[in-house]
């Protein structure tokens, strides 16, 4: 897929998903605990599968798909990249479905590729804020490894009205939005040349 998110963003995304304690189930009703729990479970499985991943790198993609992707609102992100002027009513439904499928697979690959940059850096979360009644939230954190300046990140999540659960859709690192960056880069191409250009 021609849509290419920066490696630094996917790396930071994985760092923000790290947590202090493993949980048996993910609490998607609380965006703060959801982010921490997802990361912890993902990295715990990676740690336990280190030897198998070395033998079969494709296993890392499987882990991303099973542990991380269920908590990413990839369809919402994919639609945002299409742009506000995209005419969904006139769009070829089969192409739209294929676009979402390719976008999903791209995210899996991006997260798997970025994991080689993660080296157990410390993630310090800002205190939980009241999100009662909100449909979106921004979870702020600082990534610290002692070798470089701290990196400020903000993880954006949204609440699904139907499922009543929170999912992630964007990452902002040092004021730069991963999603907005892709919208600025690809929305004009989609608008003028069509969805085929990004599949």
Feature map (PLM): residue ranges:
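Low-complexity, intrinsically disordered terminal/linker segments enriched in charged
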Residues: 170-199
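Bacterial N-terminal signal peptides
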Residues: 8-16
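A beta-rich soluble binding module of mature secreted/lumenal proteins
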Residues: 136, 141, 150-158, 190-199
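Bacterial N-terminal signal peptides that target proteins for export
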Residues: 1-9
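Short beta-strand edge/turn micro-motifs at domain boundaries
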Residues: 150-180
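Surface-exposed, charged secondary-structure patches
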Residues: 109-151
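Sec/Tat signal peptide C-region and signal peptidase I cleavage site
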Residues: 17-23
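Early exported N-terminus immediately downstream of N-terminal targeting peptides
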Residues: 25-111
